[in-house]
A protein has these predicted regions:
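Short Lys/Arg-enriched alpha/beta "domain-start" segment
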Residues: 1-16, 27-29, 33, 39-44
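Nucleotide-activated chemistry modules centered on ATP-dependent adenylation/adenylyltransferase
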Residues: 1-20, 51, 56-63, 69-114, ...
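N-terminal targeting/anchoring "stem" of glycan-biosynthesis enzymes
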Residues: 265-266, 376-390
């Protein structure tokens, strides 16, 4: 896979950086557009390495960058390759060559965090932190969700601006065609997300020297997935430090938002099941979030969700996977603490149906399936253990 013909195009207040990407059977021009005030200097192709490394491993090619790349990032590439290949042994162990290594030039002072309005990002943009310090910018990326129509994309930006206003922080809106390149090669964005967000972060290194990636993992479920505390920070350079935020369960994040920043609840949007800027209320992500809100006594404050839980959808849900099961167990005890035993019983039923399901299954061939592989193997191990009498799901 070859990266060449880096280009810069300036339009009004925006700067677009792009490069031609070529591989056996494919050719694509990848771009990212950012406001001028945060745009990275031209000639630095470090971000393209972050975006393309997993793709090169998937197509079985080495990565040749005919431009300059951060020395620090190049030194960490073998470790990133080791992680990816350990998580999916089908991957080619790609080598990366750059035309030139960049000398350190110093980092900008800005501190940013991605904002999609999901539970993870809403918690990350609101919670106080010591390192890397208080946020100075929030970042919303247009076109990162392929399902979204033009009208929904515009509404997503409007709502992200309103949420940023509640937080008293400026919103940086950026744009990219990254998913048009990655989806045909790595079909599951969850496998790609750490490298993809690092690509976007590097494009803003002219104004942001530190960027936080919201954590989707819980403290006890830091397992292989495309965005991980084991992985994300290794995409850093001397000019840009990338932080994977502190892990916490989603029910705990929701409870914190209810306690500390309830004014943000109307902006929560977790649903990617449909082309909409609010939430369907029926998909697993919606049900998990609505149950977490109900357990905190605040579902009606989150006005982008239906006001009532869809009990028929919950009655059909079978919760599998290490992290979903941990979060549903937490939701169950939080509901019981509030005296919501009937709803807690429905949650327990979803856990029981998931435990009764087979741990085996065919892994997809259109993506590395890091998380699915790890959870399948973990569920197999649990299923092989002898169960004591009276053991729960």
């Amino acid at each position: 896979m070859i990266v060449d013909q880096l280009g810069t195009r300036e339009r009004a207040d925006d700067v677009e950086r792009s490069a031609r990407i070529r591989w056996d059977g494919g050719d694509f021009r990848l771009f990212v557009s950012t406001p001028r005030r945060v745009a990275a200097p031209s000639g630095d192709a470090s971000g393209f390495v972050c975006a393309l490394l997993l793709l090169a491993m998937r197509v079985g090619e080495d990565l040749e960058v005919r431009s300059s790349v951060s020395r620090r990032l190049l030194e960490r590439v073998p470790r990133i390759v080791d992680l990816y290949a350990t998580w999916d042994p089908r991957l080619h162990r790609s080598r990366v060559r750059a035309e030139q290594e960049l000398e350190p030039r110093g980092a900008a002072a800005g501190v940013g965090c991605f904002l999609s309005r999901g539970v993870d990002s809403m918690h990350s943009v609101a919670v106080p932190r010591g390192l890397p310090g208080a946020l100075t910018e929030l970042v919303h990326c247009d076109r990162l969700e392929p399902k979204h129509s033009v009208a929904v994309r515009a509404e997503e930006i409007r709502l992200a601006r309103e949420a940023a206003r509640e937080l008293g922080l400026p919103l940086v809106v950026i744009d990219t065609n990254l998913r048009e390149l990655t989806d045909p090669i790595v079909a599951d964005w969850a496998d790609m997300v750490g490298g993809g967000l690092a690509f976007l972060a590097h494009a803003m290194a002219g104004g942001l020297g530190h960027v936080v990636i919201p954590s989707s993992a819980a403290p006890t479920t830091v397992i292989p997935t495309g965005s991980s505390p084991m992985l994300d920070a290794m995409f850093s350079s001397d000019e840009l430090e990338i932080y994977h935020d502190a892990p916490a369960t989603r029910p705990a994040k929701v409870a914190w938002l209810v306690r500390e920043r309830a004014e943000l609840l109307p902006y929560l949007k977790v649903c990617f099941h449909e082309d909409r800027s609010d939430n369907c209320g029926r998909c697993p992500k919606c049900l998990t979030t609505m149950l977490s809100l109900e357990a905190a006594g605040a579902l009606r404050l989150a006005t982008a969700f239906p006001p009532e839980l869809d009990r028929s959808a919950l009655a059909e849900l079978a919760v599998q996977g290490i992290q979903p099961r941990e979060e549903f167990r937490e939701i169950e005890w939080r509901l019981r603490e509030r005296g919501a035993d009937e709803l807690a019983g429905l949650v327990a039923g979803a856990l029981a149906r998931g435990a009764a399901g087979p741990p085996d299954g065919e892994l997809p061939t259109d993506s590395p399936a890091f998380l699915a592989r790890a959870e399948r193997d973990a569920m197999r191990a649990l299923a092989s253990q002898p169960r004591s009498r009276g053991a729960g799901p």
